């Protein structure tokens, strides 16, 4: 009677793949017959759950981890796996992707300790890795911003980052990430201008044609200053006295993030694709990195991380048709609000959930000094119009209003708006009104700004 093959607790890798009985000897008889002696080694086994906290050196030989090099190679490969869509809508999937990338990308938070990211008592980092002055000279190029500081020191290639961003930004992602593109000239034109005229600083600013003040300290009446030559940069605070019935809808068909259509029929017949928030979130991150230090960036990203699960729960079942319907609702609501806001007379600004300004009325332009062309013809974010402290408060307020409290409104007691002239701010009290779509996602934020005259 022939001897039977004795079973062993650990099979070799060849027998394990074939699901056959193996022997304790190495090489086993099966591998010898097939000429596989060189690869006849114990198959790696998974670590038991009850041994998860036991160091490798204290484990028995049979349950120790397999080839460490293979595991590290597998881990490195997984880091570069493309984002797998988890939403039924491509637009929603891209928006979630950029939110995840902002929070987890290597260019921002990989070198930041987890206790600093999730603990509000973490130690402050004295070394600022980002520029804080709001000047064009301090804004780094896009090529430099696409890499973390450590990568710039070691000269690591940025091709993988560009491929990752190009995937998230859609078909035109590679074009948007070219090195020669001046991101902050194209998308962020709101850099304050220096006022070098000393006489312009000392005198009361007004427009003699409409005989009205600026919102600042007043020492005399405009009629007394009629003989003073008005400055070309002066901005009138006079309201439009034209009849509301004669007012036409000021739509901008070439600006996708603003009011594009003048009638509801155009909205329902011409909108055939959803609005992409992805490029807006990406550009917002680039702008914040050029303006704030590391500690502020971490705090803002913490706010983004808090509402990400809520976004997943709401958007996971949305289809592409749902996202198109969202944009139709946005344009239809904006068209309706345009008629209402024009008669209200309160400085008002409307922006999307990624912060892109999509509508301003005449009173807001008169209050801040920024024209509609400045704010709407390029990608402009509401945080560009605020001072640093107001921007920090913005993310906390947005997180609270948009994804926690459903009362629909919030008040910022103090919000300082920046003007085209460096060093000049307008202190306001701001009321936020949040408009949600039928699915519960934040659709738009309507901000009403009332100047605090005594402190302007």
Swiss-Prot record:
InterPro entries documented for this protein: ERT1_acuK_gluconeogen_tf, PAS, PAS-like_dom_sf, PAS_13, Zn2-C6_fun-type_DNA-bd_sf, Zn2Cys6_DnaBD
Q: Which positions are tagged coiled coil? A: none
Biological process terms in GO annotation: cellular response to starvation; gluconeogenesis
Instruction: Indicate yes or no for the key word Amino-acid biosynthesis.
Output: no
An annotated GO cellular component of this protein is: nucleus
Q: Does the keyword Cell membrane apply?
A: no
Alphabetized Gene3D superfamilies for the sequence: Zn(2)-C6 fungal-type DNA-binding domain
Tell me which UniProt keywords the record has, alphabetically: Activator, DNA-binding, Gluconeogenesis, Metal-binding, Nucleus, Transcription, Transcription regulation, Zinc
- Gene Ontology molecular functions: DNA-binding transcription factor activity, RNA polymerase II-specific; RNA polymerase II transcription regulatory region sequence-specific DNA binding; zinc ion binding
Annotated stretches, region: Disordered: 123-160
Positions of the DNA-binding region = 12-40
Q: Where is the composition biased (Polar residues)?
A: 129-140
Q: Please give the chief subcellular localization of this protein.
A: nucleus
Q: Which SUPFAM superfamilies match?
A: PYP-like sensor domain (PAS domain), Zn2/Cys6 DNA-binding domain
Residue ranges occupied by any PAS domain in the UniProt entry: 333-405
Recorded hits in SMART domains, A to Z, give:
GAL4
Compartmental location: Nucleus
Q: Which residues form the signal peptide?
A: none
Cite a single Pfam family from the UniProt record: Zn_clus
CDD domains xref list:
GAL4 (cd00067), PAS (cd00130)
Give the family, as the similarity comment puts it: Belongs to the ERT1/acuK family.
Q: What does this protein do?
A: Transcription factor which regulates nonfermentable carbon utilization. Activator of gluconeogenetic genes.
The protein's name: Transcription activator of gluconeogenesis ERT1
Query: Can you name the source organism?
Result: Lachancea thermotolerans (strain ATCC 56472 / CBS 6340 / NRRL Y-8284)
Origin organism lineage: Eukaryota, Fungi, Dikarya, Ascomycota, Saccharomycotina
